[in-house]
Amino acid sequence: MSHFDRVRDYLTALQDRICNVVETIDGQSHFHQDHWQRTEGGGGRTRLLRDGAVFEQAAIGFSDVCGTHLPPSASVRRPELAGANWRACGVSLVFHPKNPFVPTTHLNVRYFRAEREGKQVAAWFGGGFDLTPFYPFDEDVVHWHTVARDLCAPFGDERYAAHKRWCDEYFVLRHRNETRGVGGLFFDDLDKDFERDFDYQRAVGDGFLDAYFPIVTRRHDTPYGDRERAFQLYRRGRYVEFNLLFDRGTLFGLQSGGRAESILISLPPLVRWEYGYHPLPGSAEARLADYLLPRDWLEESRICE
C-alpha cells in the first residue's frame, strides 16, 4: 500500500471514531453525511451534527483532493513547487458546543504530496489541535496540555515545547493582540521520515479524543443563563475573524477551488458582534483576557501544587 493510501485509510477511520464518540456524548442528534466530488479532482465526505443536547454544531470533514497547480497560499511558502501536480488529504473538525462553559475546539491532520513528471518532489504532514474556552477552568487547560505533552514525549524532549510555541504563534488575531484560545499543538512541513512523521500524526489524531472529550463530559451540564450565552456568541465572533483572515487551511481551500460549503462549515451557526464592548472589571468575562496570551500552563500548574 502506498504512503498516501495508508494516511488516507487512517484519516477516514479517525473521522468515524470521532463521530461515534460525539454521538454517544450528545445522546440526541446524529451526524448527517454529504458526499461530494470536486470538478478539478477528488472529493470528500462532510459530516454535520446540529442542534444536539451538547453540541450546537459539530462539523468534521474528510477530503482527498488533487490539482495541477498549487494555489498561492501554498506556493508562496514553497515557490519551488509552483506548477507541480499535487494531492492532499486531511481531516478537519470544529465543534461549537451549546453550553458556554464547554470550549470550542479545532483539530486538523493532513498529508500533502507534490509531483512533477510523475515523480514525487515533496511530501509532508501538518496539523494540530487547539482549544478556545469562553469561561476557562485551569483544570481543563492543564489537562489539555498534559495530553499534548505526553503524546509528544516519544518524539523527543523538544517536540511539545516547539509545537506548542508554533500553535501560540499561529493562532493569533494580530489585529486584536490576543490568541484565539489557550493553544495546543501546531505543526507543518513535517517531512524528515515518513514512518516517524506518520506515527506523530496518528498520536495527534488519537490524542485529541483523550484531550477534549473529558472536558466536554465535565462541563456540559454546568448551569448558565442569558449573560453567559451572550458572551459566548460575542467571543465566537473572534473565531470567525481568525478563520476568514488568517487560517491557512481556509485560504488554501478557497484558492484551490475547494468546496466552499465544506470549507466554511467551521464557522459557528450563531454569532454576534458588539461595537466597543468591554467586560466589567473583575467579572468572569474579564477573566478570559488572562488566558488569551502564550503561557506555560504546565509549569504554572507545577509551581502552584
Swiss-Prot record:
The record marks H175 as: Important for dimerization. GO terms for cellular component: cytoplasm. Substrate binds at S92, N108, V109, R110, G257, G258, R259. Keywords: Cytoplasm, Heme biosynthesis, Metal-binding, Oxidoreductase, Porphyrin biosynthesis. GO terms for molecular function: coproporphyrinogen oxidase activity; metal ion binding; protein homodimerization activity. It is found in: Cytoplasm. The keyword Cytoplasm applies. InterPro entries: Coprogen_oxidase_aer, Coprogen_oxidase_aer_sf, Coprogen_oxidase_CS. Residues 239-274 are annotated as: Important for dimerization. It holds the Pfam family Coprogen_oxidas. Pathway: Porphyrin-containing compound metabolism; protoporphyrin-IX biosynthesis; protoporphyrinogen-IX from coproporphyrinogen-III (O2 route): step 1/1. Its EC number is 1.3.3.3. Homodimer. Involved in the heme biosynthesis. Catalyzes the aerobic oxidative decarboxylation of propionate groups of rings A and B of coproporphyrinogen-III to yield the vinyl groups in protoporphyrinogen-IX. This is Oxygen-dependent coproporphyrinogen-III oxidase. The gene is hemF.
